[in-house]
């Protein structure tokens, strides 16, 4: 899985929502997509009685998905790329910016 986790703030770098930022709500690794809060909104037509949340049915707006390749993780206000680094032991490991330190 690329260096993206649920709860990360990401920036869309390609597509109709290019340049916008949001928080990752859900990862779909088998499809290579992410769902981002309040971005890529799609409308779904819900039949009456299908769900407890909408017993009357109607048209529901919810977040669509974006390809993982079209988003970058933000640290502070800057997008960052992850890199492979060599540790002292010589093992390669995927690395990303330490979000926990910069978030405080």
Curated annotation (Swiss-Prot):
Keywords: Ribonucleoprotein, Ribosomal protein, RNA-binding, rRNA-binding. GO terms for biological process: translation. Residues 85-96 have a biased composition (Basic and acidic residues). The keyword Transcription regulation does not apply. One of two assembly initiator proteins, it binds directly to the 5'-end of the 23S rRNA, where it nucleates assembly of the 50S subunit. Part of the 50S ribosomal subunit. Disulfide bonds: none annotated. Residues 85-104 are annotated as: Disordered. GO terms for molecular function: rRNA binding; structural constituent of ribosome. It comes from Anaeromyxobacter sp. (strain Fw109-5). HAMAP family: Ribosomal_uL24_B (MF_01326_B). Pfam families: KOW, ribosomal_L24. This is Large ribosomal subunit protein uL24. Belongs to the universal ribosomal protein uL24 family. One of its GO terms (cellular component) is ribonucleoprotein complex. It comes from the Bacteria. The keyword Plastid does not apply.
């Amino acid at each position: 899985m690329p260096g993206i986790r649920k709860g990360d703030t990401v920036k869309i770098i390609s597509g109709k929502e290019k340049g916008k930022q949001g928080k990752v709500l859900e990862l779909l690794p088998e499809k290579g997509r992410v769902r981002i809060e309040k971005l890529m909104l799609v409308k779904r037509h819900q039949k009456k009685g299908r769900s407890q949340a909408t017993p009357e049915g109607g048209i529901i707006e919810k977040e669509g998905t974006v390809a993982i390749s079209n988003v970058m993780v933000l640290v502070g206000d800057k997008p960052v790329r992850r890199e492979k680094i060599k540790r002292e032991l010589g093992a390669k490991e995927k690395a990303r910016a330490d979000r926990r330190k910069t978030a405080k």
